[in-house]
């Protein structure tokens, strides 16, 4: 019963191609040897690699030797007819001679012919029929046992039903080969008998053999039987069988079947030569094997499920590029999957027409990857790629910047920068980009792939676009013009370069890199702030000692005009002294502050205002002597000009930056003042050597050698209260300069170097500063500490004569003659031309006098700045007029010294401040007079 069931299953599946088998003759086994060598070299072994269940094919378990003998037969997957099982079946049917079945009647033969033609089930299109035709099974140890059992059952049945058939079978057993002994004729149910057990046995007894005979002997027997069949008038039976219509297929196969007649048509053809029609069959086999190469052998897939439309794609891939490994991987499918057990299929939105046009295009070799030039920035275009695919929508960009589509070369990782490597498909993950709207619209038939520089999954981080605007968006435009909590009211006219630069840098954010964007944002903020300081609004907020106040009620016009006239009086380009201003400066402190902070510059060159806050205690002293204070003089002698504020004030009056890459983060390496060094009164540097008067530098440098040996010159600066108002060269709270320093500030012939900055604005007891050498690290434009820390400014303008001297020797102003609500103040100023230096001290809280002692007095530094903080008056300043030549503004001790360029016709020498001197050098004109 087991054999009968197996034969019945084979009968239902096996006869699958004989309806058209008479049109195309099949070759014998010898010509298929060459096909086996060429086709199976793709698989690299003799064992079966595509073993499918037996019900997919048309042969049973006992046919395995026959299939190995036949080799790779033609598998026609287009019309769904498989001829594999009928190649050997035709020979076995012809070997069952017609003389053995002469008892069969003509109606039976005609019914058998029609049943045979109807019993050919149409197999499924695709690779299933292909695999069933090229299967190579390994040898089964139970083949001999099954053959003997089938022989005994078929012999006993045939002896009862068909007399004389068993002797003929036994006679033929001497002539059959081992391959034909395994052939199992598909049994067909009998129409006359209802037994399900007898019919398979009756069909089996036609092909079961026991003994094995050589190939040559079997061929001679076949030729004899074919000749004998022709003599008995098989042509008449063939004509009758073709004219009959389709009836039922429940008819047993007889010796007069069409398979026998098909074999008789090939009698004159030698066994060693294939027929002419075999060339087309070999080409089809090559096409099918090549499709298996792309589907199975190289990609390592296990279960393969393909559609019917994939057959045309698989066949067309052979002509595309058969010898290339990379083209072979991706030839038969658009999307490649790796790994075992995965299903291979195309996306749902891609049909057969799209794939066919894809592979027939001129750029079939560049379907998956479009390399671009290594040095080009523009995306590569294929002939059939539309220009609209890479043209961006400029309306979405805030700057109207054209965005181009990214080529795979633009998506390379940092490790594989500008590598034109072909994408590899060895890792088992889907390495294709997600199809978007452009891919689905089929306007672009090529889908870009992400390249990889190795066989690892390093293409995952390449999904990001290199445009960093997605990662770091620009600042909101509303908060762009705010600085330390105070709104910056800059001029927003289109002609203003500051506003245009700020708008470009902040609102759009169209920078190349993040560093340049940050630099331009800082630059724009500082420019807006400086522009706001030069053109302030009524409601500008300034904070002083953590207290905000509004200066909208301060009259600005009169104070600016008066101060400008005072400044113009001091220099040759101004009117003579006799034409000095007659009216006094308003006595409101806010007016003086407004004029000092926001006085507009008359020209494009540097015209800063220098602010010095002093703490003199008004007291008259007839002897003109100054007694030093032992408690404060040594602790405050190292305090000097705030270097950062001088550079900030210089930046306010100079031109904009020419290079956008210059940083404003306060680094000393990249200075943004290079393009505007002409506007600087003296060269700003950190290690300065006076090249013109080296002797004077040597005299000053000896004083600080001992201090440099004490500690490191780069002590961390921790005092954040030293940054004063922006437009000030120097501001020292609760201390003052001597006459020499005041003369240099007025003549504008001094340079800036690294100076100590323990200024401690607003503190009642400033800390003891370190030596000068310990605090000479400069932090120019330290944006972290740019604050509006303004003190209560009391202004005082000193007398400056026409010869360029610092002060008049005998200029004395008595405060008792003025309307001044404080203690009488008497200031005696002498010149430094004779080498004098100035010391400050106070004997009590009510009097103070300035004296210029001789240089013979032993001091540690060329100048020291003592602090008098025990008394500070907050009364309003007073203005007076002295001798009609100059105007002196007296206040609570703070002095305002306006500075401008030297008089016209006078060539000042830029005398820089050394790192270790701490004081400006003496001008050659001043030292030559006395």
From Swiss-Prot:
A matching Pfam family? AMER
Function description: Regulator of the canonical Wnt signaling pathway. Acts by specifically binding phosphatidylinositol 4,5-bisphosphate (PtdIns(4,5)P2), translocating to the cell membrane and interacting with key regulators of the canonical Wnt signaling pathway, such as components of the beta-catenin destruction complex. Acts both as a positive and negative regulator of the Wnt signaling pathway, depending on the context.
* Positions with biased composition (Basic and acidic residues): 222-242, 439-452
Q: Which GO terms describe its cellular component?
A: cytoplasm; nucleus; plasma membrane
Report residue spans for region: Disordered. Answer: 1-33, 55-76, 104-133, 161-193, 222-245, 366-454
What is the protein's major site of localization? cytoplasm
Keyword Transcription regulation on entry: no
Protein name per the record? APC membrane recruitment protein 1
Regarding the membrane, this protein is recorded as:
Peripheral membrane protein
Report the record's Gene Ontology biological process terms.
negative regulation of canonical Wnt signaling pathway; negative regulation of Wnt signaling pathway; positive regulation of canonical Wnt signaling pathway; regulation of canonical Wnt signaling pathway; Wnt signaling pathway
Please name the GO terms that the record assigns under molecular function.
beta-catenin binding; phosphatidylinositol-4,5-bisphosphate binding
- KW Protein biosynthesis (keyword) present: no
Question: Which residue stretches does the UniProt record annotate as biased composition, category Polar residues?
Answer: 377-399, 413-424
Keywords linked to the UniProt accession: Cell membrane, Cytoplasm, Lipid-binding, Membrane, Nucleus, Wnt signaling pathway
Mind giving the lineage of the organism this protein is from?
Eukaryota, Metazoa, Chordata, Craniata, Vertebrata
Q: Which family does it belong to?
A: Belongs to the Amer family.
Report the locations given in the UniProt record.
Cytoplasm; Cell membrane; Nucleus
| UniProt source species | Danio rerio
Q: Which domain of life is it from?
A: Eukaryota
InterPro entries (UniProt xref): AMER
């Amino acid at each position: 019963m087991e054999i009968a069931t197996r034969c019945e299953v084979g009968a239902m599946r096996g006869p699958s191609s004989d309806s058209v088998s008479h049109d195309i003759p099949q070759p014998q086994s010898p010509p298929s040897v060459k096909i086996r060598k060429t086709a199976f070299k793709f698989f690299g072994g003799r064992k079966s690699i595509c073993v499918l269940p037996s019900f997919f094919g048309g042969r049973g378990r006992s046919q395995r030797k026959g299939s190995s003998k036949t080799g790779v037969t033609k598998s026609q997957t287009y019309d769904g007819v498989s001829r594999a099982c009928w190649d050997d079946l035709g020979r076995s049917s012809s070997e069952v001679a017609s003389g053995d079945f002469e008892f069969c009647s003509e109606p039976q033969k005609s019914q058998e012919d029609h049943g045979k033609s109807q019993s050919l089930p149409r197999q499924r299109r695709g690779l299933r029929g292909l695999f069933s035709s090229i299967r190579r099974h390994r040898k089964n140890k139970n083949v001999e046992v099954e053959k003997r059992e089938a022989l005994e059952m078929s012999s006993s049945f045939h002896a009862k039903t068909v007399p004389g058939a068993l002797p003929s079978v036994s006679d033929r057993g001497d002539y059959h080969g081992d391959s034909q002994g395994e052939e199992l004729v598909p049994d067909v149910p009998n129409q006359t008998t209802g037994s399900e057990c007898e019919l398979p046995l009756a069909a089996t007894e036609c092909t079961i053999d026991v003994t094995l005979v050589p190939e040559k002997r079997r061929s001679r027997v076949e030729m004899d039987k074919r000749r004998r069949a022709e003599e008995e008038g098989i042509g008449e039976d063939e004509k009758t069988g073709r004219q009959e219509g389709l009836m039922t297929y429940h008819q047993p196969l007889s010796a007069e079947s069409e398979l026998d007649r098909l074999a008789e048509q090939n009698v004159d053809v030698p066994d060693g030569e294939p027929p002419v029609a075999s060339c087309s069959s070999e080409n089809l086999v090559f096409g099918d094997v090549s499709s298996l190469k792309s589907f199975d052998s190289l990609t390592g897939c296990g279960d393969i499920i393909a559609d019917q439309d994939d057959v045309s794609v698989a066949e067309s891939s052979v002509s595309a590029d058969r010898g290339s490994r990379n083209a072979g991987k991706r030839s038969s499918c658009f999307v490649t999957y790796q790994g075992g057990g995965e299903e291979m299929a195309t996306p749902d939105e891609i049909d057969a027409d799209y794939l066919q046009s894809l592979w027939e295009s001129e750029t079939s070799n560049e379907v998956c990857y479009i390399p671009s030039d290594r040095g080009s920035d523009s995306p590569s275009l294929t002939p059939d790629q539309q220009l609209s695919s890479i043209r961006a929508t400029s309306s979405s960009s805030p700057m109207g910047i054209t965005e181009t589509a990214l080529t795979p070369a633009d998506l390379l990782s940092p490790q594989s920068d500008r590598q034109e490597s072909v994408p590899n498909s060895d890792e088992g993950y889907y390495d294709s980009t997600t199809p978007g709207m452009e891919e689905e619209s089929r306007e672009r038939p090529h889908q870009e792939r992400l390249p990889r520089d190795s066989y690892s999954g390093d293409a995952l981080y390449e999904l990001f676009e290199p445009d960093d605007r997605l990662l770091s968006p620009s600042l909101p435009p509303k908060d762009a013009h705010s600085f330390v909590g105070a709104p910056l009211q800059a001029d927003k006219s289109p002609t203003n370069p500051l506003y245009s630069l700020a708008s470009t840098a902040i609102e759009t954010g169209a920078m190349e890199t993040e560093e340049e964007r940050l630099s331009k944002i800082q630059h724009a903020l500082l420019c807006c702030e400086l522009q706001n300081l030069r053109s302030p609004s009524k409601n500008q907020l300034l904070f002083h000692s953590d207290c905000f106040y509004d200066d909208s009620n301060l009259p600005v016009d009169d104070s600016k005009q008066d101060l400008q006239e005072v400044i113009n009086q001091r220099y040759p380009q101004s009117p003579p002294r006799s034409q000095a201003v007659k009216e006094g400066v308003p006595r409101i402190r806010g007016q003086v502050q407004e004029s000092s902070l926001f006085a507009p510059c008359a020209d494009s060159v540097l015209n800063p205002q220098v602010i010095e806050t002093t703490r003199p205690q008004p007291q008259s002293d007839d002897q003109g002597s100054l007694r030093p204070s032992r408690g404060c003089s040594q602790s405050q002698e190292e305090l000097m000009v705030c270097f950062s504020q001088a550079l900030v004030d210089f930046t306010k009056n100079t031109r904009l930056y020419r290079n956008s890459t210059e940083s404003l983060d306060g680094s000393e390496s990249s200075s943004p003042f290079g393009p505007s060094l002409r506007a600087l009164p003296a060269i700003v540097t950190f290690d300065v050597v006076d090249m013109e008067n080296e002797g004077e530098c040597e005299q000053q440098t000896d004083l600080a050698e001992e201090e440099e040996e004490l500690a490191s010159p780069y002590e961390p600066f921790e005092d954040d209260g030293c940054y004063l108002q922006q437009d000030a060269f120097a501001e020292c709270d609760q201390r003052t300069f001597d006459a020499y320093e005041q003369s240099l500030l007025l003549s504008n012939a001094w340079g800036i170097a690294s100076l100590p900055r323990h200024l401690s604005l607003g503190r009642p007891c400033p800390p003891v500063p370190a030596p000068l050498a310990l605090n000479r690290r400069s932090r120019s434009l330290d944006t972290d500490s740019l604050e509006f820390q303004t003190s209560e400014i009391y202004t005082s303008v000193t007398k400056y004569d026409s010869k360029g001297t610092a002060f008049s020797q005998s200029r004395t102003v008595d405060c008792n003659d003025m309307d001044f609500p404080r203690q009488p103040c008497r200031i005696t100023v002498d010149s430094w031309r004779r080498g004098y230096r100035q010391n400050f001290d106070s004997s009590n809280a009510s009097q103070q006098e300035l004296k210029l002692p001789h240089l013979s007095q032993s001091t540690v530094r060329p100048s020291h700045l003592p602090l008098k903080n025990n008394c500070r008056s907050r009364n309003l300043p007073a203005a007076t007029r002295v001798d009609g030549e100059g105007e002196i503004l007296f206040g609570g001790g703070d002095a305002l010294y306006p500075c401008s360029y030297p008089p016209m016709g006078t060539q000042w020498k830029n005398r820089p401040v050394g790192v270790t001197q701490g004081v400006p050098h003496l001008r050659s004109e001043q030292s030559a007079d006395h």
